[in-house]
Amino acid sequence: METFKKAMNESAWVRWSVLILVGFILSVNYYFYDAFSTLNDLLKAEFDFTNTDYGLFVSFYSIPNTFLLMAVFGGMILDKFGIRRTGFGFVFFMAFCALLSAYGASSYYGAGGFGHAFMNGFWPSYSPELKMMLLGRFFFGLGAETSIVVVCKILVKWFKGKDLALAFGLKVGFGRLGTFAALRISPALADEGVHLTTAIWFAAVLVLSGLLAFMVYMLLDAKLDKQTGFSQKASSSASEFSFKDFVSIISNRAYIYIALLCVTFYSAVFPFMAYAPDFFADKFGLSAVESGNITSWLPLGTMLFTPLFGFLIDRYGRSATAMIFGALTLVAVHLIFAFTTLTPIIPL
């Protein structure tokens, strides 16, 4: 029987088990983020949300990471305090704030539960339900994005020099699995509004289970550090933040080009995902369940093809060519949606 005389990250089955564990954390993160995209019309009916309200709710996720640079500061905190402490703190924050958003949509809160009177006392143009959900969404985004950075560092720690691009491709696949599940399960649980809060609470409890999964990972991480003689204190000292290093990174032209590519690429994907079920329902007359099912084909394709491209890039390179191909394909898809009446299954 195999023993752990060698470091745990040298064992293939342990590495892939770690990937599955942290991939689950990523999946529930994406599940909660996308669970509301198929509930847009139901939120309007239940809480009198407008399209502007829904857009505000979706956008609040990004505020702490865009305007407060929390993803950047989260990376600094990660370098300073390490995977276990940083990861637990931000995943806990993510789980708590997912529950806070669900609480804002609950009938107990709507009937005057804790915090309702306070939320009703300001910003009168928005409902107390929306304000509580915005609060949860804001802080969920703060925790969720840094937790993604933590997952990336975990994969580097376990897969460096061992199929790292494939591991990152599978990481993306796990995230899209969460999106796929949300688009399929959320409208079914909501049952045309009969059980809207059930769908939201289910998403929040999944995020809570992600916190439990991270606690399990912490045990494996501590054991690996013990085997390799890794010292968090020494690591944090070596990773001490330097403003000079920060300036060096943001003035690096290659980094700037990659960052701009990510911004433009994701701005064409994630806003579309948030509104796609509503778009398909309006343009093609589909129900919430049908439009959610069709939208779910997009993350399904990502789950299948991202690991494949990761494997090919590991073996043959050509990452720039793959990026250009992906960008051109995305342009073609949006043009088809905008100017044709083809069934949405084809471009997706």
What are these regions (language model features)?
Residues 17-51, 272-277:
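Extracytoplasmic
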Residues 36-40, 252-306:
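Extracytoplasmic gate region of multi-pass secondary transporters
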Residues 59-76, 296-309:
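Central cavity-lining transmembrane alpha-helices of secondary-active solute carriers
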Residues 79-91, 314-327:
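Cytoplasmic membrane-interface "Motif A"-like loop-to-helix N-cap segments
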Residues 92-126, 328-342:
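C-terminal ends and interior cores of transmembrane alpha-helices
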Residues 130-132, 136-175:
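Cytoplasmic helix-loop-helix junction between adjacent transmembrane helices
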Residues 171-225:
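Helix-loop-helix hairpin linking two adjacent transmembrane segments in secondary transporters
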Residues 218-244:
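Flexible cytoplasmic inter-helical loops of multi-pass small-molecule transporters
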